Every structure is written in structure tokens, then in C-alpha cells.
Regions:
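Alpha-helical transmembrane-bundle signature of multi-pass membrane transport and export proteins
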Residues: 1-424
Length: 424
């Protein structure tokens, strides 16, 4: 945070930070609606024409749009007014939800419209995140950024947990209900963000260039930062194999006759573990070194994933998922807070866009890998393949001198270090 930003920001507890509270609560409201709509969209497609192919296409559209817009969104967050970007995203999602609501009520819904709405949801999600992340260090003091990052992680897990549970329930009440709730949630978030005050950014030294050049500049800068590069690559590999493992476990549980209700509980426990882990993250971050907080996630997943081979009860698997989800928020808090505080303000949006793209690729390829493994080999063998992949990257993380020297951030008057300090 610049000294000017610090002068504008109170150093009271985050709960009494007006701007952070507005940003956090608005995004929570928005994310709950988005999660509910994300569950309701495939159910709506199935209700319209019963096509599993169309259902998969709609879900793929959300993910594809989010991936495709990620890097451009980061560049735009460094170029445009970040508050206006967030407001525009909420307004667009409210309008998209309203269009579905109207089409359902008028019996005029088409799959093409659902695809367009899904694309709008994906693009808006990609646009909002870099703008919010880049603005975060300007609305909270440097020393509170780690706690703010942890609270944002808890918010995401809580919204996913509550929204996905509510989506199916609301759709059972009526087809229009989840989309009405989604529209209201985005309208409420838009209203809250209207009152958000973000300190003005310093004038750019040079006028904005061509967008594609700014995107390449962001990619180049992120790649040149050794710590960011190593942590991102290791996280991508781990997320890829865990996403595959998650699908494998769901399929394995189904083959073993685990009731659908217990399988749903397994997924819910993963989200619940994420919420609890995010709440514990600020405390754990003060007790663990950065390297231990990061490496412990890899060690824990490597040790716990093979346990799935001997579990045949959905409740016990849910407990395993809960335990697996406890430590990642601490590592994410350590990594994200340092990245934000040590990245120049004019590059923070592109940082988030690039890192989000990498995470999105892992999240998209991982389930496909898991599904392919369950088709080619037995479920138990697929678990072992995923565990082996996690073990391999764990060895790399444990031996990495870059991660072993991962520095603990010490807040300074300015979070924008000199250019020389940004070079690896």
C-alpha cells in the first residue's frame, strides 16, 4: 500500500473497516447467487430438453469463458477504474439472471440463451476477481492483508457451500426461483459496491499501450518472478492431480454403492473444511514459517489421498475431505498476500489474471484426467496414480531452494518495492 493509501485507511480491526466490509459482504452475496445459479443451470437445461450433451456444453461454457477472459481481465483491471469494473460485472450478471427469469416465465427459453448467459457469468467472474484482488491492498493496511486474504478465502468456501446447497433446493421449488435469487443477489451486491471508496490510483507514468502488449507484459513479469513462478507451477500440478482425485473418489464411491446423500455430504465436507481452514489461517500463518505453511499442504495431501483406498463409507470420506481442506487456506494466504504486497499496483490485476488462468487450467484438465483414469483402469489404481502425481510434486516442493527461502512479509511504509528488488 502506498503511503497515501495508508493515510486514507483506518488501522482498526477489519470488522470495523467500512470499505473492506462493503467489499467482502457484497462479494459474498454475489457469490452465493452465482453458486446457486451454477447448480441450477444444468438442471434447467435437463428440464428443457433432457440433453446431457447440452448440459455439459453449458457448464463448459462457463469455465471456458472464465479461462479465456482471465488474462485480458487482469490487463483491464490495471487500466480501468477497478470499482467501475466490479459494478459493471454485478450489473451484467443481474441483467443476465433477469433475462433467464423472463424467458422462463414467458415460456420462451432456448438453449442458445442459456449458453449466452453462461458465457456472461464466466466473463464477469473473470473480470471481477483481478479488480477486487488488485484493489484489496488499497482498502486495508499492509499488516492486515493476510487476514483479509484469509477472510476472502473463507467467503469463497462459504458461498460455494451454501450456494450449491441452495441451488438444487430452490430449483425444486420452481425453475425461476434460483435465477430470481441470483438476480437479487447481484443487484444487492451492486448496491453495496456503490458505497465503496477506493483511494485514487497514482497517475501512470506512460499512457496505456495496446491491450495485447500489456497482457504480454504481465505474463512476462510474472514469469520473471522466480518465487511466483515456482509456487504457481507447483500449485498447478497439485491442483491438477487433486481435481482428478476428487472425480476418481466420487466415481469410486458410486461403484462401491455409497448412497447419493453421502456422496453429497462428501462434497459439502470439503467446502466446510475450507471454511474452517480459512478461519484458522491468520493464526496458523503467525505460527508456521512460510515454507512449512506451503509444504505442509503437499505433505498432507500425499499422505491422506491413499487413505481413500480403504474407506467405504461416505461419512468417513467426508471426514477425510474435511481434513484435506484444512491446510490449503493457510498456504494460499501466505502466497497471495506476499504476491499482492510485493507487486506494483499497476501490475496487480495482471498478476491475478495470470495466476487465475493457471489455476483454471488445472481445474479444467484435472476432472478430465480423473474421468479418463476411471475409464482406463480400476478406481483403486486411479487413486494410486493421483497419489503418485502428488507425491512427485511434493518431492519437488520439499527440495526447492526457492520455496525454502520463501520470505515472511514484513509490512513496510510502501508495498511497491523498487524495480531492482522485483527482479529474481
Amino acid at each position: 500500500m502506498t503511503s497515501a493509501s495508508a493515510d486514507r485507511t483506518t488501522r482498526a480491526a477489519l470488522s470495523r473497516n467500512r470499505n473492506f466490509t462493503l467489499l467482502w459482504s457484497s462479494k459474498l452475496t454475489s457469490d452465493c447467487g452465482f453458486s446457486a445459479a451454477s447448480i441450477a443451470l444444468p438442471l434447467l437445461v435437463l428440464a428443457v430438453n433432457g440433453s446431457a450433451a447440452d448440459t455439459g456444453f453449458v457448464l463448459g461454457t462457463v469455465a471456458t469463458a472464465q479461462l479465456a477472459a482471465g488474462v485480458p481481465a487482469g490487463a483491464l483491471a490495471d487500466r480501468w477504474n477497478r470499482k467501475l469494473i466490479m459494478l459493471g460485472c454485478e450489473a451484467a450478471q443481474a441483467i443476465a439472471g433477469a433475462s433467464l427469469l423472463a424467458a422462463i416465465l414467458l415460456h420462451a427459453l432456448t438453449i442458445a440463451q442459456v449458453v449466452v448467459v453462461a458465457a456472461a457469468f464466466g466473463v464477469c467472474a473473470a473480470m471481477f476477481d483481478p479488480a477486487e484482488d488488485a484493489a484489496l491492498p488499497t482498502v486495508v493496511p499492509d499488516e492486515q492483508v493476510p487476514k483479509a486474504v484469509a477472510m476472502n478465502a473463507a467467503r469463497a468456501s462459504l458461498a460455494h457451500l451454501s450456494g450449491t446447497g441452495a441451488g438444487g433446493f430452490l430449483f425444486a421449488i420452481g425453475r425461476v426461483v434460483p435465477f430470481a435469487a441470483d438476480m437479487v443477489s447481484h443487484a444487492a451486491a451492486f448496491t453495496g459496491l456503490l458505497f465503496l471508496r477506493i483511494p485514487p490510483r497514482e497517475a501512470a507514468a506512460q499512457p496505456p499501450g495496446q491491450l495485447h502488449r500489456e497482457m504480454l507484459e504481465g505474463l512476462r513479469w510474472v514469469w520473471q518472478q522466480r518465487t511466483i513462478r515456482v509456487t504457481a507451477l507447483c500449485a498447478v500440478v497439485l491442483n491438477l492431480f487433486f481435481s482428478a482425485f476428487y472425480i476418481v473418489v466420487i466415481v469410486l464411491a458410486h461403484r462401491r454403492g455409497v448412497p447419493a446423500g453421502q456422496i453429497g455430504l462428501m462434497a459439502a465436507m470439503l467446502g466446510a473444511g475450507g471454511v474452517v481452514g480459512a478461519l484458522l489461517a491468520p493464526y496458523l500463518q503467525t505460527k508456521l514459517s512460510p515454507f512449512i505453511s506451503i509444504a505442509s499442504v503437499f505433505w498432507a495431501l500425499t499422505a491422506l489421498t491413499p487413505v481413500a483406498l480403504v474407506i467405504r463409507n461416505g461419512y468417513l470420506m467426508g471426514a477425510l475431505f474435511f481434513g484435506i481442506a484444512l491446510l490449503p487456506p493457510t498456504a494460499n494466504t501466505t502466497i497471495t498476500s506476499r504476491q499482492l504486497l510485493n507487486t506494483p499496483d499497476h501490475l496487480r490485476g495482471r498478476l491475478t489474471g495470470v495466476v487465475g488462468l493457471a489455476a483454471g487450467i488445472a481445474g479444467a484438465v484435472g476432472p478430465m484426467l480423473g474421468g479418463t483414469l476411471t475409464q482406463l483402469i480400476s478406481g483403486s489404481q486411479a487413486v494410486l496414480v493421483c497419489a503418485a502425481g502428488m507425491a512427485a510434486i511434493t518431492v519437488v516442493v520439499t527440495a526447492s531452494p526457492t520455496l525454502r527461502r520463501f520470505p515472511r512479509h514484513e509490512p513496510t511504509e510502501s508495498s511497491e518495492p523498487p524495480v531492482a528488488a522485483l527482479k529474481p
